[in-house]
């Protein structure tokens, strides 16, 4: 015992020898991590639990979309747009077809413009439902995902009814949309999960047309949003995880080129639907929700309020579309395919259809930039034509790319657990980030 005490006293008498070197360590967050929301690889330099530096690594989902679009006729690249932000499909299509229409000097019929406006907002609600469910799940609130996917499934049925696909719709076309809205909705069939009174209740809103179904949806959806807010907005744990976490000042948001809820959450009222109206946004009434503190909680409140505003817009579009039937595609036969009925009787129509979908059409030489207010921010398409049937250059402006670039500036000084909350409010989808 005396030997141990002598050694201890000797060690304590020489502080230089007892001083240990404390160094930061590096941690790989993702790409195989459920909170990475895809294939994000975030290399974190940590001082204990505190983030000192964050280095995002991207490219793991790069598919060369821009080059693929340059190798095909203009009208054959619409499906590629669906696969960029694969949670906000039709908004991506909208930017691309608007760019083609701008170069060709054509404008979609009024009914098609209202349909596009309506489906842009359906897409916004779908995106935000996915976001609120997955973000809550990241922070431990599991029930919200089940509630959100209940409504999202109904909107997926709307996608399927109008295009035949639940996700990659390819519904928007240069000059209009693929077809008019259907007169009936898909109905649930009897199974071991759905039978009897429960089956009748599920199909009650599906007896009429799609517009009838959407009218019923818009009447009930505000109550559903109230349910999400009951679970989260005043939840003590939710507020502890999001209030004053990931604060982005207005100057920082502008400096990094942020758009959408990320920008509006910092208190900047910028929305392309109001500032640079397209489609029929100048004919509908809606407000722009903005935050005050620029933290994760404000970005949550902005997105929840946006769902309510999107519901208002859909309701107005449904009312107009019910009262105003009409064409949904231009009559310019260089762009619009002939009817299926016409192809059965007319050889010229059949030849025209074949050439349109095999060779496409030549677009006048020029360049344009078209942007839409996608759910995640400004999604833009720069398109250059040299007069051929294929684009000379396609460049896509993805909001998530600009947002992810700011990750290092935003997360410094926060705890590792807060990084999960911040990644969630960034609402990243790597289909558009990596392109």
From Swiss-Prot:
Pfam families: Complex1_49kDa (PF00346). The lineage of its organism: Bacteria, Pseudomonadati, Pseudomonadota, Gammaproteobacteria, Lysobacterales. Keywords: Cell inner membrane, Cell membrane, Membrane, NAD, Quinone, Translocase, Transport, Ubiquinone. It is a peripheral membrane protein. It comes from the Bacteria. The keyword Transcription regulation does not apply. This is NADH-quinone oxidoreductase subunit D. It catalyses: a quinone + NADH + 5 H(+)(in) = a quinol + NAD(+) + 4 H(+)(out). GO terms for cellular component: plasma membrane. Its EC number is 7.1.1.-. Belongs to the complex I 49 kDa subunit family. Its main location: membrane. It is found in: Cell inner membrane. PROSITE patterns: COMPLEX1_49K (PS00535). GO terms for molecular function: NAD binding; NADH:ubiquinone reductase (non-electrogenic) activity; quinone binding. NDH-1 shuttles electrons from NADH, via FMN and iron-sulfur (Fe-S) centers, to quinones in the respiratory chain. The immediate electron acceptor for the enzyme in this species is believed to be ubiquinone. Couples the redox reaction to proton translocation (for every two electrons transferred, four hydrogen ions are translocated across the cytoplasmic membrane), and thus conserves the redox energy in a proton gradient. InterPro entries: NADH_Q_OxRdtase_suD (IPR001135), NADH_UbQ_OxRdtase_49kDa_CS (IPR014029), NDH1_su_D/H (IPR022885), NiFe-Hase_large (IPR029014). NDH-1 is composed of 14 different subunits. Subunits NuoB, C, D, E, F, and G constitute the peripheral sector of the complex.
